[in-house]
Amino acid sequence: MKPRLFAFDSNPWFSNWMNRQHILSRLGARGWPVVYSTGPMSVTEVRSLGVSRCSLRWHTRVDHNVAVPLPSALMPTSTRWSTWNALAYAIHAHRLRAVLPSAVDGGDIAMLFNPEFFPLLAYLKPRQVVFHVRDAYPQIPGWSAHQEANFRALQRRADLITVASKKLLDVLQADVRDKARVLLNGADVDNIARCLSEPCPTDLAAIAHPRVGYAGVISQKVDIALISALAQRQATWQWVFVGPIPGGEGGRMGGSQTAYAAWTALLALPNVHWLGAKPHQDIGRYMVHMDVNTMPYVVDDRAGGWARYAYPLKLHEYLAAGLPVVSADMIDVQRHRDVLELVDGVEAWEAALTRALAGDAPGNTETRRALAKANSWDGRVDDLETWLTDLAGRP
């Protein structure tokens, strides 16, 4: 029997699909009892939402073979009272264990995608701990000493560390790298293949060609200044954005008024279009009906140096669509120069997009899709399941 797997991250399950959902849903489909939690609500969250909009009940939804306990405002955490916090964590851990019956006594595995959940381990008491490093956490603007302490403690406690890019090995302490494995982001190739035979979505069909696409979260990691310059230099190119803004339409791109003002100014251009967030199963319908797909990320320190460590989720999904891909020059993506073009600077971007739209891009439809198939999420989870099975067999 497979042990329960308790997974934690700050992103709500019922939101934009990221590697968490792709990984955990596949483990659930393979018979792993999976519970996904964003932790107990905080007093700040309750106040922000308003008590009347918060549920005081503890209830669970099952989605894609994963049990998802929905947030409850009962016993929220507080930064002011450590004793109250301890009680809130203990109650939350007890509720999580009650969601699914245990088939293996004392054999639970905790999988953390974010070090902020390290304190919960003391109350959940799993036998084994997996830490999936999905970001260069210390490079995040505003990273605190408290967060760094949790990050280091979780590295020491983890029995297995997985990293979403090879470059992320560099953010780990040297003495824990021997228990680290590379688990790159993959592609839902079956879903993209299905989308290839479906008609162009109505909102996208209303936009003229050539379409230069971006699918994903629209955050400060996206180089708005670059896109603005390109959109103004090539007025016939139609830039199409498909994805959410952090915090919703009024989220102001993570609280940055400057970034949000730049985004608003970009949208005022006649050849820039934002189609909003879409269900994860429909994203591929937009990717396959572009003329070229892009990863226009900030590669300098304006976004905390994120791109130096990135292996974007959309990379292999773009390749599965079979269309040309132009990307910012990211270290871990450089190995794929034979199927996409990596560039830096407005002139280089303009030249690369011009070539792509003229049919002169690296690779072809077949080679791009072949690489995506070799990097499917199913294959990634094959590797992870092997490692988890090994963990579960340890005393």
Placement of each model-derived feature along the sequence:
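Membrane-proximal helix-turn-helix segments that form the acceptor-binding/catalytic region
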Residues: 94-101, 105, 144-161
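Carbohydrate-associated surface elements
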Residues: 167, 183-195
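A short, active-site helix/loop in glycosyltransferases that binds the activated sugar's phosphate group
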Residues: 158-182
